[in-house]
Amino acid sequence: MNPVYSPGSSGVPYANAKGIGYPAGFPMGYAAAAPAYSPNMYAGPNPAFQPGYTPGTPYKVSCSPTSGTVPPYSSSPNPYQTAVYPVRSAYPQQNPYAQQGAYYTQPLYAAPPHVIHHTTVVQPNGMPATMYPAPIPQPRGNGVAMGMVAGTTMAMSAGTLLTSHYPTPVAPHQVTMPTYRPPGTPTYSYVPPQW
């Protein structure tokens, strides 16, 4: 046993070696005995609140509103049959059976911002303001040589490179070169401003 920590028995006051003053209501000793355990959450009997669950008590509310039997188990989280509510939507992207990606629609849960701007009337939710067609990606110019298929190696497209059509070369022609003033000291040292 730890000689420094030697708890006293029940009802023995704490050892106050330094004479420290404690506020009113501070427990100056161990409790005589722990309070008895009560299964009630709240003290005192309350007829509206039952103290605990009695085993074998039937449910107050039935699981099924029409009969007292428990509905059969279904792995689907949707309690409604699919045939009762047809899956139909005015927006193709929200319809799981429509062609995906045909149009980009705005799923509207309120009116578009420009409709309710500076107004206090709640506008009805109508058709989307715009239906964007699916964007066509712009052709990107890559750094592949002319005649070479992108994503291939040189060995795969060497025949295409060698046999592809090239324009006929231009015949040599005369090029006139202008005559330049030979370098030297300029004859002027000041250029007047061009007002």
Curated annotation (Swiss-Prot):
User: May I have one GO cellular component term?
Assistant: axon
What domain of life does the native source organism fall in?
Eukaryota
Q: Where does this protein chiefly localize?
A: cytoplasm
On whether Transmembrane is a keyword of this UniProt record, the answer is: yes
- Membrane topology qualifier: Multi-pass membrane protein
Q: Which UniProt keywords apply?
A: Cell membrane, Cell projection, Cytoplasm, Membrane, Transmembrane, Transmembrane helix
Localisation per UniProt entry: Cytoplasm, Perinuclear region; Cell membrane; Cell projection, Axon
Matching InterPro entries: FAM168A/MANI
- The residue ranges for the Cytoplasmic side of the membrane come to 1-18, 163-195
- Any ranges marked Extracellular in the topology annotation, and which? 44-143
* Membrane-crossing residue ranges in chain numbering: 19-43, 144-162
- Cite a single Pfam family from the UniProt record: TCRP1
Say which family it is in: Belongs to the FAM168 family.
State its role.
Inhibitor of neuronal axonal outgrowth.
Q: What is this protein called?
A: Myelin-associated neurite-outgrowth inhibitor
Question: Which species?
Answer: Xenopus tropicalis (Western clawed frog)
Lineage of producing organism: Eukaryota, Metazoa, Chordata, Craniata, Vertebrata
